[in-house]
């Protein structure tokens, strides 16, 4: 009976092209070949830009506020740097985001924080595939929309005057 089973198996293998020994040899040959590894990486600046754009989309965020180097950089640019007020740490699969913001007076900081956190995580994950494991938001100032607009107009006027001097 065992002989019949072997004949049946051999007939099946012949019909389907399955050969156990051949399969093992192919697998061993594949294991001996050098394996190529594909890798997709993102610079910190890319993740900063994504997080900055996402945070600015949330109602109640008037602006992002940078430190001294951002202020210095904005003095020599048009001031539309979307990475201002954003810093990140990017690993191979995860990222952490720190934001410095100016909130609109009368808006709920905890609600805005939840919305910003959700949107930043969603956008970074969608665009890069990176999991955002931490979002920290520091409120550096609170302004009314009118105060913020006046400050922006003043800053734009100063930038335009500086541009005229170049």
Curated annotation (Swiss-Prot):
Compositional bias per record (Low complexity), positions renumbered to this chain: 27-38
Disordered: annotated span: 1-40, 144-166
Pfam family, any one: Asp23
Described purpose of this protein according to its UniProt entry: May play a key role in alkaline pH tolerance.
Similarity field: Belongs to the asp23 family.
Protein name: Alkaline shock protein 23
Organism of this sequence: Staphylococcus epidermidis (strain ATCC 35984 / DSM 28319 / BCRC 17069 / CCUG 31568 / BM 3577 / RP62A)
Gene field: asp23
């Amino acid at each position: 009976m065992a002989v019949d089973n072997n004949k049946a198996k051999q007939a099946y293998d012949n019909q389907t092209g399955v050969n156990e020994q051949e399969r093992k040899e192919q697998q061993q040959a594949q294991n001996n070949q050098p394996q190529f590894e594909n890798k997709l990486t993102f610079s910190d600046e890319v993740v900063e830009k994504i997080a900055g754009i996402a945070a600015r989309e949330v109602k109640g965020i008037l602006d992002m506020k940078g430190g001294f180097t951002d202020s210095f950089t904005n003095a020599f640019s048009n001031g539309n740097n979307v990475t201002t007020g954003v810093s990140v740490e990017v690993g191979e699969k995860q990222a952490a985001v720190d934001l410095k913001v100016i909130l609109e007076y009368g808006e709920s900081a905890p609600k805005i924080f939840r919305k910003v956190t959700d949107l930043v995580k969603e956008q970074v994950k969608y665009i890069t595939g990176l999991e955002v494991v931490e979002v920290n938001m520091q409120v550096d100032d609170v302004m009314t929309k009118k105060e913020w607009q006046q400050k922006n107009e003043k800053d734009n006027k100063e930038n335009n005057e500086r541009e005229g001097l170049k």
